[in-house]
Amino acid sequence: MEFKKYILKKFDYNVNVSNKKFYTPDETIKQKLEINVKFLKDRKNMLLTFKIDMIDNDDINILNLKVKYILTLNNEALDISESFIKKILSKFYPIFSKFILNFYNSIGLNNIQLPEF
């Protein structure tokens, strides 16, 4: 099953501005990815929520990010299984990834890759 369109519904982030630390490229920055999928009543639209928490080696919070999309499928989903959801997410994740990497670069978090899906 393919998706027809997607709409960015919400983009919210919080950067820890009290953290004055300068990060070097050899430091490890950990990211925790959480994905929530909810099918809407018509079973053709789904709400995707991505959350990313970024912390440094000292467990200091660097960034919290929450992005919500409405994803419209070509057809109504008849069988909503874990494998079906993974298939849809694997097709959408590159779009999400490109958007977030551009955001990371715009706020100076260059060369940071997203966690694997």
Positions of PLM-derived features:
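N-terminal intrinsically disordered, cationic/polar leader segments
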Residues: M1-K91, K98-F117
